[in-house]
UniProtKB/Swiss-Prot annotation:
Its EC number is 6.1.1.19. The gene is argS. This is Arginine--tRNA ligase. One of its GO terms (cellular component) is cytoplasm. It comes from Phocaeicola vulgatus (strain ATCC 8482 / DSM 1447 / JCM 5826 / CCUG 4940 / NBRC 14291 / NCTC 11154). Keywords: Aminoacyl-tRNA synthetase, ATP-binding, Cytoplasm, Ligase, Nucleotide-binding, Protein biosynthesis. Belongs to the class-I aminoacyl-tRNA synthetase family.
Amino acid sequence: MNIEEKLTTSIISAIKTLYGQDVPGKMVQLQKTKKEFEGHLTLVVFPFLKMSKKGPEQTAQEIGGYLKEHAPELVSAYNAVKGFLNLTIASDCWIELLNSIQAAPEYGIEKATENSPLVMIEYSSPNTNKPLHLGHVRNNLLGNALANVMAANGNKVVKTNIVNDRGIHICKSMLAWLKYGNGETPESSGKKGDHLIGDYYVAFDKHYKAEVKELTAQYQAEGLNEEEAKAKAEANSPLMLEAREMLRKWEANDPEIRALWKKMNDWVYAGFDETYKMMGVSFDKIYYESNTYLEGKEKVMEGLEKGFFYRKEDNSVWADLTAEGLDHKLLLRGDGTSVYMTQDIGTAKLRFQDYPINKMIYVVGNEQNYHFQVLSILLDKLGFEWGKGLVHFSYGMVELPEGKMKSREGTVVDADDLMEAMIETAKETSAELGKLDGLTQEEADNIARIVGLGALKYFILKVDARKNMTFNPKESIDFNGNTGPFIQYTYARIQSVLRKAAEAGIVIPEIIPAGLELSAKEEGLIQMLADFKSVVKQAGSDYNPSIIANYAYDLVKEYNQFYHDFSILREENEALKVFRLALSANVGKIVKTAMGLLGIEVPERM
């Protein structure tokens, strides 16, 4: 039983004894005492005024007096401010609470059981015509952290990815490679496969624009105005016509085109795997659009037969969503080709066949809000049980400060380049501050990797996902303030203290003995540690990993003040020294768990 539960039981007894009334536990409202008042927990007295038939101040005084007299092991002091009773919890209660946190190897984490709900989380969703970029970084980090948070709340979690591996954009890279590649491979070029294919996507665009420019001038010379000439040039570009023909052949299962498609996509997947590994994200199941788009068509036709959808004169299939306050939505074009919505329905069908899904969460940018509103309704109409409860984990754009780390094209920042730059910056900053002194080259490189990637991940994850954000590389690697490196350094500092204690032969017992006089700072730290359980729960119910990130920062900020104000290893009172070591060890444990949920490593030394 935790402190709040014990206190609630004592307050119920107080009301019964003082006012002769039985009250349910939910009527007892306890909250953290505001910093300007003395105490740890505050009871809201107003619900009991009808029972006491007295004013709020007097009622608070009576309940406080009863608790101090009849539960001195729980309440050591109290003060009343209007209708609020501020209660100071006895020191031994805090030690007991610390012991319970220490006894739990994974405090705050709820394990899934056989009967736990299954949550599927889709994130990443790359195209196979280019490398992952800065936008994917935010998506991957959010998806991975959210999966960890949902698992920590006792859910079975399946992490899934849908790869956009078909369509005209893929054919553009394929065609450019055939025309200009001279058989170049990742091995011959020394490039990652995704970067190599990305180069050919850019090459297609360059040649296509030059072709359109030339044709536009030709059509203008023949008497068309600029707008008409450009439209005709785009429609008649030989390069684009070839790309469309290649797509037609792909859809007709042309063996040569399919073999080329497979070869080039395999290069890209090998590149993606390296990026994902460096980023520390993984998937339990990967779906490919080339396998799902036909399934979607089938499901739409099934919905048409059942009268959920209707067909227009041009043979296209639509959903009428006006009853739901939306408009009419295209599901199949007149020529039978699918749209994104069809593909999402197909992917949903396959997933539902593969897993007994209770909740489906899509981690996709906020520009797709309407799309997922529609998808939820369509899936529900088609009989997918989780359709109505579908969650679109919508997030805002992420940008870089102007002029920072632009790629050669000057528009997109590759994830690989960004991570490499972060590790390099971490190495320079750490070396300047002496944080790599005395380490081998291998150890220093590993610290730079942990700090660089930790800085990137934390800076992105501390921001509420719904907000647009600017990622500032230099600011993120600051060892002071609300940053990953500040939290990592505090963890390493704690491990250093614990190593020194072990070298001095000091052993932290499994149970810290009672009878110590604790400071308000020490009690406050234990209270913060205990809060971790509710922080994890809130992050899960709100789908908000930033709650955990900011909790970790608040915790290490408090610990650093404690570290500054109190002696640990130099404390003369042995019992107090051991208590402070135990407190430090448990702060380290919770910091490591919290950062782990965000996908961030913490170094044992720095």
